[in-house]
Amino acid sequence: MPLALLARAGLTLDGAVTLQPILDALDSRSVPRALINSLDSAFFSGLIALVLGTMIALVIGLTDVRAKGIFTFLLLIPMMVPPHVTAIAWIQAMGPSSPLLQMLGIAPEPGSTHPLYSRGGVIALLSIQHMPLVFLVVLAALRALPREMIEAARIAGARPLAVLRRIVVPLLAPILISAFALAFVSALGNFGIPALLGIPARYTTLPVLLWQRLASFGPDVLTSVAAIAALLAAIAIAIIAVQMTLLARTRSPLIGPPQPPLAIRLGARRPLVETLLALLVAATLVLPVVALTTTALIPTYGVPFNLTTITFANFAEVLFRQQVTLRAFANSTLVAGLAGLMLAVIAMAVGHFLNARQKGYRRAGTALATLAETTYAIPGLVISIAFILAFIRPIPVIDVSIYNTLIIIGLAYVCAFLSIALKPVTAACAQLDPALDEAARISGARFFMRMRRIFAPLIAPAAASGAILVFLTAYNEITVSALLWSTGNETIGTTIYNYEDGGYTTLAAAMSAVTVVATIALMVALDRFGKRLPPGVVPWRI
């Protein structure tokens, strides 16, 4: 309903469906410029993420490098860390006042322009943020490649590059298209990185422009903002539609069930390849995390980091003294937790429909799964604007307002993150025999009894995994809640952003460091839990 109201507000005029609101929005100078910047940053960051993510996936998926599981886990952490925290970490890692660079004696000159406050900085960090997404998609596809073809080519004397060019790449072509589309759409809707790096460089993207207009003028500009939001949503949906069309036309019938990773011998080059992987992990994960931590451990930003300046006062401030941060931690834990639980239940119901033998149930499940994928492709700020349009007035009949409450944030999370909860459940459902449900139905068991006695016990671990993934995503996010939070209803993401935007850099760093530790801890817990789950449920387990 909220998205339908957004379409109505952005695509109608005097009761008639028309593109005039979008054309009127494009008449201003700021909207076309922001549109070009959005497409520019999404395209080039998606391209870089595709190249890097595919190369890493090929190395881990096809060669005999050691510690594949550890490398996979570490490479996926940047994807789970929210974009605004990534931006803050890199700002503090590369700037003239960076405690880390000052300690190493290689900091830029004081007063010089930050190197990341530029178009290149936005594209670079978007690439780092979405490279793990491409890596994950391509690695999963590599596990489904028929090993017999690759091994036969190797036995016949084909060199690794020939195998890659003649067998692997042609089979992966549709997957590479899909991976690029996912990276493109993710970058298109990204708010945290373009806001923190693009605003100082006057490189404004559409999500940032939407936020600026609503933050400056409030609900009075909802109609014009709805047109821009509808344009952004239309672009995202069009990209996904093109992706699905290309995938449907490009058939790869040799793709099969998941198999253990291949191990083409690298010989004497293996230590070099492993060193390059370790350097990549150090550059994309260790460097920004160390920079974030050193900033959090100094009393004031700009003070050199050494044994005499180290202090834990910033951590004490955000964890024990600041009411706004305590409230934000509590709010995010509550809302993300409830959203995860609700989506686990919904995902189990959708999974049951997808696994049913009756065509009606399967069609309903397919429709809901498609809707979930489409909603996930829509930028979070667009979803938040849709919920503002839907709930800015009290709900009819009951006359209760949820605007400016945690409820509206929670409902937006349910809408935005259903696809995340659904993926582990559908992976587990693919391994169930529909005959179990059919036998219970023939025996007279009703729907809820079949769910409770048969389906739920088998799928519950995968649903729990999906709930944890939703919690990980929603706990730190800012894209959805940036326009929905209010005083007393702050989230972790909005509080960190407000600290950084207000100049409280050390507090922002301390709070960001806490969220990074919490994210990694939850990922480790899910990894341990994933040992008892079917393959494909926990994304990074290979």
Language-model region placement:
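Polytopic alpha-helical membrane proteins, predominantly small-molecule transporters/carriers
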Residues: 35, 157-158
